Regions:
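Conserved glycine-rich cofactor-binding loop
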Residues: 12-13
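Substrate-binding pocket helix/loop in short-chain dehydrogenase/reductase
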Residues: 89-90, 97-99
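Residue(s) in the substrate-gating loop at a strand-loop-helix junction
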Residues: 133
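A glycine-rich helix->loop->beta "capping" turn
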Residues: 67-78, 86
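Active-site helix of classical SDR
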Residues: 113, 149-152
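C-terminal beta-strand-loop-alpha-helix "lid" module of Rossmann-like NAD(P)-dependent dehydrogenases
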Residues: 166-215
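The beta1-alpha1 cofactor-binding region of Rossmann-like NAD(H)/NADP(H)-dependent oxidoreductases
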Residues: 53-63, 95
């Protein structure tokens, strides 16, 4: 396998960290990017370069891409992994928090694509792997703004795949299901805090408890499950448009497609009664 120069964001923990290690183990030159560079220092022992990058800061992203191009002369793969989930009722999530959700999950991802595309186009080759979610194919109770962000990633990736193909650039999406990371705990805390003292507090508190219990259990897939899909998307000669992976990913998408909307809505509300 030819060595690729890879930039991966959100690499300080969870899926990003696991994927950075696996890509390096496969012989690729990996640039791991995140805000907390201190958490990524152990990656250096595996031959991974560490970059400070804030995906809400355009200059930070531009500086990071420029540093890689200066050192390597090319970027073969961008893995857009940075993201988080802010849960809460549409009415109670502040516009500031909603904008931040989109800044991190959508606009940061889009800006990094814009920054690497000129170099990839000049190379006549390249690959962009966007970490989406089954949350871009279904909607959960109180997940409104997070789902807006992931549905946007799906649409942007589909559009970019068509636009970039004539230049030899492939675009793939990873759609994880329930993965055992801190994501669910953080989302549950956001939900509880955003609903405090509002008309939604009772259901939101119960749903937050359901989320927390789910993500503290041992029934979820590990980050390595997603990493395997990322490796396939990076190394395949002809990558698929979508790689669905992780526990319940196929089941969630199937039932969201199959069930009438009122049945799905009732199923989601039932989760707040458990």
């Amino acid at each position: 396998m030819e060595q690729k120069i890879i930039l991966i964001t959100g690499a300080s923990s969870g899926i990003g960290r696991d994927a950075a290690l696996a890509l390096a183990a496969h012989g690729h030159k990996v640039y791991a990017a995140a805000r907390r560079t201190d958490l990524m220092e152990p990656l250096r022992a595996h031959g991974i370069e560490v970059l400070h990058m804030d995906v809400t800061d355009g200059q930070s992203m531009a500086d990071g891409v420029e540093a890689i191009l200066k050192a390597e002369g090319r970027i073969d793969v961008l893995v857009n992994n940075a993201g988080y989930g802010y849960f809460g009722a549409v009415e109670t999530v502040s516009m500031e928090e909603a904008r931040r959700q989109l800044e991190v999950n959508v606009f940061g991802l889009a800006r990094l694509c814009q920054l690497v595309l000129p170099a990839m186009r000049q190379q006549r080759s390249g690959r962009i792997v966007n970490i989406s979610s089954v949350a871009g194919r279904s909607v959960f109770y109180f997940g409104g703004w997070y789902h807006v962000s992931k549905y946007s990633v799906e649409a942007l990736s589909d559009a970019l795949r068509m636009e970039a193909k004539p230049f030899g650039i492939d675009v793939a999406m990873i759609e994880p299901g329930a993965i055992k990371t801190d994501w669910g705990i953080i989302a549950a805390d956001h939900l509880r805090d955003s609903a405090a003292g509002t008309a939604y507090e009772t259901d939101a508190t119960r749903w937050a408890a359901t989320l927390r219990s789910m993500y503290q259990s041992n029934h979820l897939s590990s980050p390595s499950t997603v990493t395997r899909a990322i490796l396939r998307a990076v190394e395949s000669r002809r990558p698929r448009a979508r790689y669905r992976t992780g526990r319940l990913s196929g089941t969630i998408v199937f039932f969201h497609w199959l069930l009438p909307a009122r049945w799905w809505d009732a199923l989601m509300r039932l989760g707040a009664r458990v």
